């Protein structure tokens, strides 16, 4: 019996991550890359966040990535006039305490896209399975197999095909073409309409940046445009210039840009301040690499057809201003690798039904995780580009209130809900925040009807407490009565429920935590697990969802709260 074979189209971050996972799992694969070499000088830099670093650690790659990457220790934002409007750092004991309590143990870092691809490629033991200069020309079914015809006429047959060939995926185009003929209800034309573009971006690099600015991510705000500047310890620096398009375009109408378009954007905005003392024009003159591309944004509602599945930018694409794209690609590849391994544990030759189940699970997980990241990136872009007076006010006046503890909370939520590969050795917890898989009281989905029922119940309990108090005579020095405490507790719960409704979170996932700390400082910790220095009470299910900040409740304080994890 021939070994189950996975054909990977594209030597991208997602494609090479999947190749590494499959190799670790002993699953045969063939990777086809259309370009003459693996890891060409395309793109500028990518940011690897804690959830991605955890997966790279499982593959044994964290140390090598850290050698080549620059950690992000500070985040600063600059207004149109060149003054700082945001400086996120742990600048006081309060911020440091909360940031430490929410630590994941992994520092976000940026690395050249080419370097990350090289790390992934170099880690492969069986490099003979990777073939350059072989792009996809056509897909067709061959019984219970898939036949791939490459651009040079070579035919390769496998059990499944994984399209990891980017935003302009040839694999995606092929399955849409096939589905249009075989199953018009698949809706490929509707899927294509979800691919939209509202911004374009100049990706660039200089080799003579100021290394004294390293380890800081700079974001420059301008009207209908924005800039990201990432200097490294070596003096190399990466920059991204985002420009809002005149109108939103969809799929085939999304423009392609020429060198003349790039020159025009630079000429129009050369005086924009990137950091104090450095303009966009100055930076562009010193560029060693640069390109102007459209920024597609989308999440496909369907990411597979029969025995072909899409990963990475082929299925979801977000604005790079938050640096989350590579992380999603790594996570998706790791998840799909786990699902393929799981199917093969049931049968060495999984049936169509078994593979469809695996792909559907991957699709649903992607649709659960990716939307918030795509929406966050879109919102950050709108804020940075000062798109309207309200966003201008928020960016230039309110953003300066952001602190390290608030940033740490967002990182903790993202990390805790990330994926961990099931069939590789599980790593010890590095920071204070665990993954959901390590939490006993995991969050659950809850229907809105249950939330409404709890609201009614809590209102009833609050009313009982209030009625009882009307019949009690309390002296000035009398301690608070138990029913008053009941009323206050109920009011607290109602406020959580109200916050949940306001944030549109009814029916989403939440977990209740309750911590005591003799120090009197009780930072709100993440997702159902307390470090040793805290004494957790029994976690209980509650309805609603809220993300509170730190609470200082006095010596021996006690804190209950709910943390968003979906």
Curated annotation (Swiss-Prot):
GO terms for cellular component: membrane. The chain crosses the membrane at residues 448-468, 482-502. Pfam families: FAD_binding_3. FAD binds at residues 33, 47, 113, 313, 326. Its cofactor is FAD. Its EC number is 1.-.-.-. This is FAD-dependent monooxygenase asqG. It comes from Emericella nidulans (strain FGSC A4 / ATCC 38163 / CBS 112.46 / NRRL 194 / M139) (Aspergillus nidulans).
């Amino acid at each position: 019996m021939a070994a189950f074979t996975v054909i990977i189209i594209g030597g991208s971050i997602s494609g090479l991550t999947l190749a590494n996972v499959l190799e670790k799992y002993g699953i045969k694969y063939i990777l086809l890359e259309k370009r003459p070499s693996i890891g060409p000088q395309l793109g500028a830099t990518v940011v690897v966040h804690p959830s991605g670093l955890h997966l790279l650690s499982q593959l044994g790659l964290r140390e090598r990535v850290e050698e080549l990457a620059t950690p992000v220790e500070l985040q600063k934002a600059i207004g149109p006039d060149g003054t700082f409007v945001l400086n996120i750092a742990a600048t006081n004991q309060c911020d440091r305490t909360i940031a430490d309590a929410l630590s994941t143990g992994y520092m976000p870092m940026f690395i050249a896209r080419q370097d990350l691809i090289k790390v992934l490629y170099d880690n492969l033991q069986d490099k003979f399975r990777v073939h350059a200069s072989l792009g996809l020309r056509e897909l067709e079914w061959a019984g219970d197999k898939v036949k791939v015809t490459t651009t040079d006429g070579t035919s390769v047959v496998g059990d499944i095909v994984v399209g990891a060939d980017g935003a302009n995926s040839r694999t995606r185009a092929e399955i849409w073409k096939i589905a249009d003929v075989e199953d018009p209800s698949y809706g490929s034309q509707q899927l294509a309409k979800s691919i939209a573009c509202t911004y374009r971006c100049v990706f660039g690099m200089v080799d003579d940046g100021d290394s004294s600015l390293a380890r800081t991510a700079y974001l420059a705000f301008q009207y209908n445009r924005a800039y990201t500047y990432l200097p490294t310890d070596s003096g190399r620096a990466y920059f991204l210039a985002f420009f809002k398009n005149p109108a939103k375009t969809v799929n085939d109408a999304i423009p392609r840009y020429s060198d003349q378009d790039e020159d025009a954007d630079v000429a129009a905005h050369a005086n924009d301040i990137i950091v104090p003392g450095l303009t966009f024009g100055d930076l562009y003159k010193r560029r060693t690499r640069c390109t102007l591309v459209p920024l597609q944004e989308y999440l496909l509602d369907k990411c597979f057809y029969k025995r072909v599945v899409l990963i990475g930018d082929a299925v979801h694409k977000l604005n790079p201003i938050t640096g989350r794209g590579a992380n999603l690609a790594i996570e998706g590849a790791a998840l799909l690798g786990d699902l393929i391994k799981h199917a093969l544990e049931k049968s060495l030759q999984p049936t169509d039904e078994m593979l469809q189940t695996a792909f559907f699970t991957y699709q649903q997980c992607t649709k659960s995780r990716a939307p918030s990241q795509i929406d966050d990136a879109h919102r950050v872009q709108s804020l940075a580009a000062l798109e309207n007076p309200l966003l201008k006010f928020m960016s230039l006046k309110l953003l300066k209130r952001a602190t390290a503890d608030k940033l740490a909370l967002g990182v903790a939520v993202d990390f805790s809900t990330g994926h961990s590969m099931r069939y590789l050795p599980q790593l010890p917890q590095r920071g204070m925040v665990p993954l959901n898989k390590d939490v006993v009281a995991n969050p659950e989905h809850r229907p809105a009807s249950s939330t409404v029922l709890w609201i009614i119940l809590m209102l009833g309990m609050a009313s009982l407490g209030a009625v009882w108090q009307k019949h009690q005579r309390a002296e000035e020095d009398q301690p608070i009565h138990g029913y008053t405490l009941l009323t206050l507790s109920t009011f607290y719960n109602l406020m959580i429920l109200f916050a949940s409704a306001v944030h549109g979170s009814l029916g989403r996932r939440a977990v209740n935590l309750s911590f005591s700390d003799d120090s009197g400082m009780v930072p709100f910790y993440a997702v159902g697990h307390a470090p040793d220095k805290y004494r957790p009470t029994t976690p209980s299910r509650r309805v609603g969802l809220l993300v509170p900040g730190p609470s200082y409740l006095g010596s021996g304080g006690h804190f209950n709260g709910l943390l968003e994890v979906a």
